[in-house]
């Protein structure tokens, strides 16, 4: 399977220490199986941080989810209540129960797969956290959002499953 990472730099070696915390699935290296999504992210990142848009292409074995010592959390393609709680917990900077199964701030999952929480969803999350809307309203707002796909890698053993194939400027 091919996975794509949109950036403003060519990535030869993945360094988890360079990854930012409090992302949808926790601190990790994020990719997508949707080429166009990575290309858009590359443009966005290069616009914000400078440089040229570049898409780094990696491969992973199709059956990686079956590897015994790799813990994978797969939400599928749909936004669900479980997914929403997981994303909110990972984005929460004051969460105290990081061992909760619906959180990955402690990297209990090596790989997490699921929809992307876009900027509109981030607004919904903030409204919910500030008690401006209830959970039912949050879920209703998310159900109709167009989602896309992300694969996040959180541990060195999961990073070792990725093989760099190529890069191209986009």
Task: Set out the residue ranges of the language-model regions.
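Short, flexible loop/turn elements at secondary-structure junctions
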Residues: 8, 35, 62-64
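Short aromatic-glycine-(Arg/Gly/Cys) micro-motifs in beta-strand/loop hairpins
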Residues: 1-23
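Extended catalytic/binding region for NAD+/ADP-ribose chemistry, centered on the ART fold
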Residues: 20-45
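Conserved NAD+-utilizing ADP-ribose enzyme module
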Residues: 23-24, 44-54, 60-170
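Short, conserved beta-strand segments within well-ordered enzyme catalytic domains
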Residues: 3-5, 30-31, 57-59
